Curated annotation (Swiss-Prot):
The keyword Mitochondrion does not apply. GO terms for biological process: tRNA modification. It comes from Staphylococcus aureus (strain NCTC 8325 / PS 47). Coiled coil: none annotated. ATP binds at residues 7-20, 100, 153, 178. The gene is tmcAL. NCBIfam families: PRK13670.1 (NF010191). This is tRNA(Met) cytidine acetate ligase. The lineage of its organism: Bacteria, Bacillati, Bacillota, Bacilli, Bacillales.
Length: 379
Protein backbone atom coordinates (compact mmCIF):
# COMPACT_ATOMS: atom_id res chain seq x y z
CA UNK A 1 0.00 0.00 0.00
CA UNK A 2 1.31 3.44 -0.96
CA UNK A 3 1.35 5.83 2.01
CA UNK A 4 1.57 9.56 2.58
CA UNK A 5 2.48 11.00 5.98
CA UNK A 6 1.34 14.31 7.44
CA UNK A 7 3.12 15.82 10.45
CA UNK A 8 0.41 17.63 12.36
CA UNK A 9 -0.98 19.09 15.56
CA UNK A 10 -4.66 19.58 14.62
CA UNK A 11 -5.14 22.18 17.33
CA UNK A 12 -7.96 21.86 16.44
CA UNK A 13 -8.74 20.11 13.14
CA UNK A 14 -10.22 22.44 10.50
CA UNK A 15 -11.04 22.78 6.80
CA UNK A 16 -7.44 23.66 5.95
CA UNK A 17 -6.30 20.36 7.42
CA UNK A 18 -8.98 18.48 5.49
CA UNK A 19 -7.80 20.19 2.29
CA UNK A 20 -4.18 19.29 3.10
CA UNK A 21 -5.01 15.60 3.58
CA UNK A 22 -7.13 15.38 0.43
CA UNK A 23 -4.53 17.18 -1.70
CA UNK A 24 -1.74 15.00 -0.28
CA UNK A 25 -3.61 11.85 -1.20
CA UNK A 26 -4.46 13.19 -4.66
CA UNK A 27 -0.93 14.35 -5.53
CA UNK A 28 0.78 11.16 -4.33
CA UNK A 29 -1.89 8.62 -5.35
CA UNK A 30 -1.58 7.23 -1.84
CA UNK A 31 -3.74 4.36 -0.64
CA UNK A 32 -3.48 5.44 2.99
CA UNK A 33 -3.00 8.77 4.79
CA UNK A 34 -1.10 8.73 8.08
CA UNK A 35 -1.36 11.71 10.45
CA UNK A 36 1.54 11.94 12.92
CA UNK A 37 -0.02 14.19 15.55
CA UNK A 38 1.18 15.95 18.70
CA UNK A 39 -0.40 14.71 21.91
CA UNK A 40 -1.79 16.82 24.75
CA UNK A 41 0.88 19.53 24.53
CA UNK A 42 1.84 21.26 21.29
CA UNK A 43 4.81 22.98 19.69
CA UNK A 44 3.52 26.48 20.50
CA UNK A 45 4.39 25.63 24.11
CA UNK A 46 0.88 25.20 25.43
CA UNK A 47 -1.72 22.52 26.12
CA UNK A 48 -3.75 21.48 23.08
CA UNK A 49 -7.20 23.07 23.19
CA UNK A 50 -8.77 19.57 23.10
CA UNK A 51 -7.18 16.37 24.34
CA UNK A 52 -5.41 14.05 21.93
CA UNK A 53 -8.27 11.52 21.83
CA UNK A 54 -10.81 14.13 20.73
CA UNK A 55 -8.41 15.56 18.15
CA UNK A 56 -7.64 12.07 16.82
CA UNK A 57 -11.39 11.55 16.36
CA UNK A 58 -11.56 14.83 14.46
CA UNK A 59 -8.65 13.78 12.23
CA UNK A 60 -10.23 10.41 11.47
CA UNK A 61 -12.95 12.25 9.56
CA UNK A 62 -10.39 12.50 6.73
CA UNK A 63 -7.15 10.66 7.63
CA UNK A 64 -6.89 6.86 7.78
CA UNK A 65 -4.44 6.42 10.64
CA UNK A 66 -3.47 8.75 13.51
CA UNK A 67 -0.16 8.17 15.32
CA UNK A 68 0.96 10.09 18.42
CA UNK A 69 4.15 12.13 18.14
CA UNK A 70 6.41 11.72 21.22
CA UNK A 71 5.68 14.39 23.85
CA UNK A 72 9.28 15.59 23.98
CA UNK A 73 9.23 16.26 20.23
CA UNK A 74 6.26 18.59 20.63
CA UNK A 75 8.11 20.55 23.31
CA UNK A 76 11.38 20.90 21.39
CA UNK A 77 12.80 23.23 18.76
CA UNK A 78 11.63 22.92 15.17
CA UNK A 79 14.63 20.81 14.17
CA UNK A 80 14.17 18.23 16.94
CA UNK A 81 10.40 18.22 16.37
CA UNK A 82 11.01 17.53 12.68
CA UNK A 83 13.70 14.93 13.31
CA UNK A 84 11.55 12.80 15.60
CA UNK A 85 8.47 13.24 13.38
CA UNK A 86 10.43 12.06 10.34
CA UNK A 87 11.73 9.09 12.34
CA UNK A 88 8.15 8.18 13.26
CA UNK A 89 7.21 8.45 9.57
CA UNK A 90 10.12 6.16 8.69
CA UNK A 91 9.03 3.70 11.42
CA UNK A 92 5.59 3.73 9.78
CA UNK A 93 7.24 3.03 6.40
CA UNK A 94 5.81 6.23 4.92
CA UNK A 95 6.60 6.74 1.23
CA UNK A 96 6.07 10.52 1.08
CA UNK A 97 5.77 13.32 3.63
CA UNK A 98 3.45 16.15 2.55
CA UNK A 99 3.72 19.45 4.40
CA UNK A 100 2.03 22.81 4.03
CA UNK A 101 3.95 25.91 2.99
CA UNK A 102 3.29 29.45 1.85
CA UNK A 103 5.28 29.43 -1.38
CA UNK A 104 4.83 25.80 -2.50
CA UNK A 105 8.33 25.80 -4.03
CA UNK A 106 9.91 22.54 -2.91
CA UNK A 107 13.09 23.18 -4.94
CA UNK A 108 13.77 26.49 -3.16
CA UNK A 109 13.01 24.94 0.24
CA UNK A 110 15.46 22.08 -0.44
CA UNK A 111 18.15 24.59 -1.44
CA UNK A 112 17.51 26.55 1.77
CA UNK A 113 17.70 23.35 3.84
CA UNK A 114 21.13 22.65 2.34
CA UNK A 115 22.29 26.25 2.91
CA UNK A 116 21.12 26.25 6.53
CA UNK A 117 22.96 22.99 7.21
CA UNK A 118 26.16 24.70 6.02
CA UNK A 119 25.46 27.89 7.99
CA UNK A 120 24.99 25.96 11.23
CA UNK A 121 28.56 24.66 10.90
CA UNK A 122 30.07 28.11 10.25
CA UNK A 123 32.07 30.40 12.55
CA UNK A 124 29.64 33.24 11.81
CA UNK A 125 26.81 31.17 13.27
CA UNK A 126 28.80 30.41 16.45
CA UNK A 127 29.69 34.09 16.86
CA UNK A 128 26.08 35.25 16.58
CA UNK A 129 25.03 32.64 19.16
CA UNK A 130 27.64 34.12 21.52
CA UNK A 131 26.14 37.56 20.86
CA UNK A 132 22.88 36.27 22.33
CA UNK A 133 20.79 36.31 19.18
CA UNK A 134 17.89 33.89 18.69
CA UNK A 135 18.21 31.04 16.19
CA UNK A 136 15.53 32.38 13.76
CA UNK A 137 17.20 35.80 13.73
CA UNK A 138 20.65 34.34 13.07
CA UNK A 139 19.45 32.23 10.14
CA UNK A 140 17.52 35.17 8.72
CA UNK A 141 20.59 37.43 8.91
CA UNK A 142 23.02 34.92 7.44
CA UNK A 143 20.66 34.09 4.59
CA UNK A 144 20.18 37.80 3.89
CA UNK A 145 16.56 37.82 5.07
CA UNK A 146 15.37 35.33 2.45
CA UNK A 147 11.63 35.92 2.03
CA UNK A 148 10.78 32.22 2.41
CA UNK A 149 11.99 32.42 6.02
CA UNK A 150 9.25 34.89 6.92
CA UNK A 151 6.75 32.02 7.11
CA UNK A 152 6.61 29.60 10.08
CA UNK A 153 5.35 26.82 7.80
CA UNK A 154 8.21 27.28 5.34
CA UNK A 155 10.70 27.19 8.22
CA UNK A 156 9.18 23.97 9.56
CA UNK A 157 9.14 22.51 6.05
CA UNK A 158 12.86 23.23 5.77
CA UNK A 159 13.37 21.38 9.08
CA UNK A 160 11.51 18.36 7.65
CA UNK A 161 13.72 18.40 4.55
CA UNK A 162 16.87 18.59 6.70
CA UNK A 163 15.63 15.65 8.80
CA UNK A 164 14.77 13.57 5.73
CA UNK A 165 18.21 14.20 4.21
CA UNK A 166 19.85 13.18 7.49
CA UNK A 167 17.71 10.27 8.70
CA UNK A 168 15.36 8.95 6.00
CA UNK A 169 16.63 9.47 2.47
CA UNK A 170 14.12 6.85 1.27
CA UNK A 171 11.21 9.22 2.05
CA UNK A 172 10.04 11.67 -0.63
CA UNK A 173 8.68 15.11 0.24
CA UNK A 174 6.09 17.35 -1.38
CA UNK A 175 4.87 20.80 -0.44
CA UNK A 176 1.23 21.89 -0.59
CA UNK A 177 0.38 25.57 -0.70
CA UNK A 178 -1.68 26.81 2.22
CA UNK A 179 -5.03 28.28 1.28
CA UNK A 180 -6.00 31.83 2.32
CA UNK A 181 -5.50 31.90 6.10
CA UNK A 182 -2.09 32.87 7.46
CA UNK A 183 -0.51 30.99 10.36
CA UNK A 184 -0.94 33.77 12.95
CA UNK A 185 -4.27 35.28 11.78
CA UNK A 186 -6.15 36.11 14.99
CA UNK A 187 -9.62 36.58 13.50
CA UNK A 188 -11.79 34.35 11.32
CA UNK A 189 -12.58 35.89 7.94
CA UNK A 190 -15.64 35.16 5.81
CA UNK A 191 -14.26 32.25 3.80
CA UNK A 192 -13.95 28.52 4.42
CA UNK A 193 -10.35 28.53 5.69
CA UNK A 194 -9.05 29.99 8.95
CA UNK A 195 -5.91 29.72 11.06
CA UNK A 196 -5.77 27.52 14.13
CA UNK A 197 -5.08 30.66 16.19
CA UNK A 198 -8.31 32.34 15.06
CA UNK A 199 -10.35 29.16 15.60
CA UNK A 200 -9.03 28.73 19.14
CA UNK A 201 -9.80 32.38 19.86
CA UNK A 202 -13.34 31.90 18.59
CA UNK A 203 -13.90 28.74 20.64
CA UNK A 204 -12.49 30.25 23.85
CA UNK A 205 -14.60 33.39 23.29
CA UNK A 206 -17.65 31.14 22.91
CA UNK A 207 -18.78 32.72 19.65
CA UNK A 208 -19.97 30.64 16.69
CA UNK A 209 -17.67 32.01 13.97
CA UNK A 210 -15.70 28.75 13.89
CA UNK A 211 -18.68 26.76 12.58
CA UNK A 212 -18.05 27.46 8.88
CA UNK A 213 -14.30 26.70 8.98
CA UNK A 214 -14.40 23.16 10.40
CA UNK A 215 -15.97 20.06 8.78
CA UNK A 216 -19.70 19.91 9.46
CA UNK A 217 -19.83 16.20 10.26
CA UNK A 218 -17.52 16.56 13.29
CA UNK A 219 -18.68 19.89 14.74
CA UNK A 220 -20.22 18.12 17.73
CA UNK A 221 -16.68 17.32 18.91
CA UNK A 222 -15.86 21.02 19.32
CA UNK A 223 -18.21 21.50 22.25
CA UNK A 224 -16.23 19.15 24.49
CA UNK A 225 -14.24 20.70 27.39
CA UNK A 226 -11.16 22.66 26.38
CA UNK A 227 -8.14 23.99 28.25
CA UNK A 228 -6.28 27.33 28.22
CA UNK A 229 -2.92 28.70 29.36
CA UNK A 230 -4.53 30.63 32.21
CA UNK A 231 -5.75 27.33 33.67
CA UNK A 232 -2.17 26.06 33.53
CA UNK A 233 -0.53 28.99 35.33
CA UNK A 234 -1.35 28.18 39.00
CA UNK A 235 0.06 24.66 38.55
CA UNK A 236 3.15 26.02 36.81
CA UNK A 237 3.66 28.64 39.53
CA UNK A 238 3.45 25.99 42.24
CA UNK A 239 5.97 23.83 40.38
CA UNK A 240 8.53 26.64 40.04
CA UNK A 241 8.14 27.72 43.68
CA UNK A 242 8.37 24.14 44.96
CA UNK A 243 11.39 23.15 42.86
CA UNK A 244 14.92 24.11 43.88
CA UNK A 245 17.09 26.14 41.53
CA UNK A 246 19.24 23.06 40.92
CA UNK A 247 16.15 21.02 40.02
CA UNK A 248 15.02 23.69 37.55
CA UNK A 249 18.51 23.73 36.06
CA UNK A 250 18.05 20.05 35.19
CA UNK A 251 14.85 20.59 33.18
CA UNK A 252 15.02 19.99 29.43
CA UNK A 253 15.72 23.23 27.46
CA UNK A 254 16.63 25.21 30.62
CA UNK A 255 20.13 26.54 29.89
CA UNK A 256 22.51 29.42 30.61
CA UNK A 257 21.16 30.27 34.04
CA UNK A 258 17.54 30.55 32.92
CA UNK A 259 16.53 28.75 36.11
CA UNK A 260 17.44 31.95 37.98
CA UNK A 261 15.12 34.01 35.77
CA UNK A 262 12.31 31.57 36.52
CA UNK A 263 12.83 31.89 40.27
CA UNK A 264 13.28 35.67 40.32
CA UNK A 265 10.22 36.49 38.19
CA UNK A 266 7.59 33.98 39.29
CA UNK A 267 6.33 36.00 42.29
CA UNK A 268 5.73 39.15 40.26
CA UNK A 269 3.85 37.40 37.44
CA UNK A 270 0.07 37.81 37.49
CA UNK A 271 -0.74 35.30 34.76
CA UNK A 272 0.95 33.08 32.17
CA UNK A 273 1.42 35.72 29.46
CA UNK A 274 2.74 38.26 31.96
CA UNK A 275 5.26 35.68 33.18
CA UNK A 276 6.48 34.98 29.64
CA UNK A 277 6.98 38.72 29.03
CA UNK A 278 9.01 38.99 32.24
CA UNK A 279 11.20 36.10 31.10
CA UNK A 280 11.78 37.32 27.53
CA UNK A 281 15.35 37.99 26.36
CA UNK A 282 16.73 38.65 22.89
CA UNK A 283 18.25 35.17 22.78
CA UNK A 284 14.97 33.29 23.20
CA UNK A 285 11.73 33.55 21.26
CA UNK A 286 8.39 33.65 23.07
CA UNK A 287 7.62 30.19 21.72
CA UNK A 288 10.89 28.76 23.04
CA UNK A 289 10.11 30.16 26.50
CA UNK A 290 6.59 28.71 26.45
CA UNK A 291 7.92 25.27 25.49
CA UNK A 292 10.48 25.54 28.29
CA UNK A 293 7.66 26.31 30.75
CA UNK A 294 5.70 23.25 29.62
CA UNK A 295 8.83 21.16 30.21
CA UNK A 296 8.95 22.58 33.74
CA UNK A 297 5.27 21.78 34.25
CA UNK A 298 5.77 18.20 33.05
CA UNK A 299 9.16 17.86 34.82
CA UNK A 300 10.84 16.73 31.59
CA UNK A 301 14.59 16.19 31.95
CA UNK A 302 17.21 15.76 29.18
CA UNK A 303 17.39 12.07 30.07
CA UNK A 304 13.68 11.76 29.19
CA UNK A 305 14.31 12.95 25.64
CA UNK A 306 14.77 10.23 23.06
CA UNK A 307 16.45 10.53 19.69
CA UNK A 308 15.15 7.19 18.41
CA UNK A 309 11.76 5.56 17.97
CA UNK A 310 11.30 2.20 19.73
CA UNK A 311 7.49 2.04 19.53
CA UNK A 312 4.56 4.09 18.26
CA UNK A 313 1.13 4.68 19.79
CA UNK A 314 -1.80 4.34 17.40
CA UNK A 315 -4.54 6.79 18.45
CA UNK A 316 -7.12 6.15 15.73
CA UNK A 317 -7.73 4.20 12.51
CA UNK A 318 -10.37 3.36 9.94
CA UNK A 319 -10.59 0.31 7.65
CA UNK A 320 -7.70 1.42 5.42
CA UNK A 321 -5.63 2.30 8.47
CA UNK A 322 -6.26 -1.14 9.97
CA UNK A 323 -5.28 -2.80 6.70
CA UNK A 324 -2.05 -0.80 6.52
CA UNK A 325 -1.23 -1.53 10.17
CA UNK A 326 -1.74 -5.23 9.53
CA UNK A 327 0.66 -4.97 6.58
CA UNK A 328 3.29 -3.24 8.77
CA UNK A 329 3.04 -5.84 11.53
CA UNK A 330 3.64 -8.57 8.95
CA UNK A 331 6.48 -6.73 7.21
CA UNK A 332 8.20 -5.60 10.44
CA UNK A 333 7.39 -8.15 13.18
CA UNK A 334 10.13 -6.74 15.43
CA UNK A 335 8.54 -3.27 15.56
CA UNK A 336 6.09 -2.16 18.25
CA UNK A 337 2.84 -0.77 16.83
CA UNK A 338 0.79 -0.29 20.00
CA UNK A 339 -2.98 0.15 19.79
CA UNK A 340 -3.74 -0.14 23.50
CA UNK A 341 -1.41 0.74 26.36
CA UNK A 342 -1.07 -1.67 29.28
CA UNK A 343 1.47 -2.51 31.98
CA UNK A 344 3.64 -4.53 29.61
CA UNK A 345 4.17 -1.75 27.05
CA UNK A 346 3.68 1.43 29.14
CA UNK A 347 7.46 1.90 29.52
CA UNK A 348 7.62 3.01 25.88
CA UNK A 349 5.30 5.95 26.58
CA UNK A 350 6.26 7.27 30.03
CA UNK A 351 6.30 10.94 28.96
CA UNK A 352 3.03 10.71 27.04
CA UNK A 353 1.23 9.00 29.93
CA UNK A 354 2.50 11.63 32.40
CA UNK A 355 1.49 14.46 30.05
CA UNK A 356 -2.03 13.03 29.83
CA UNK A 357 -2.34 12.72 33.62
CA UNK A 358 -1.22 16.34 34.13
CA UNK A 359 -3.49 17.57 31.33
CA UNK A 360 -6.39 15.78 33.04
CA UNK A 361 -5.50 17.13 36.49
CA UNK A 362 -5.81 20.66 35.12
CA UNK A 363 -8.81 20.15 32.83
CA UNK A 364 -10.79 17.77 35.04
CA UNK A 365 -11.05 15.21 32.23
CA UNK A 366 -10.85 11.47 32.76
CA UNK A 367 -9.59 9.93 29.50
CA UNK A 368 -6.19 8.32 30.08
CA UNK A 369 -3.86 6.23 27.95
CA UNK A 370 -4.98 3.16 29.90
CA UNK A 371 -8.77 3.56 29.85
CA UNK A 372 -9.13 4.88 26.29
CA UNK A 373 -8.84 2.16 23.62
CA UNK A 374 -7.70 2.94 20.09
CA UNK A 375 -10.40 4.93 18.28
CA UNK A 376 -11.82 2.89 15.42
CA UNK A 377 -14.08 3.82 12.54
CA UNK A 378 -15.83 1.26 10.35
CA UNK A 379 -17.10 2.15 6.91
Amino acid sequence: MKSVGLITEYNPFHNGHQYHINQSKKLTNADVTIAIMSGNFVMRGEPAIYNKFTRAKMALSTADLVIELPATASLSSGDHFAELAVKVADYMSVDTIAFGSENNDIKTLKQLAHSINEIEQSESFSQKVKEGKSYPRIISELLEHHEALASPNNILGISYLKAIAKNAKNINAISIKRENAQHHDSLIQHHQFASGTSIRTSIISQDDHWHHVVPKDIQHLYVTPHITLNQIFPYLKYQIIAMTTDSLKNIYTVTEGFENRLKSNIYEATDFHHFVKLLKTKRYTYTHIQRLLMNVLLNIKPTDVTSNIHAVKVLAMNDRGRQYLKHLKTAFPERQYITNINKSNAHYFTNEIKATHIYNAISGQQQTDFNTPVIQQYR
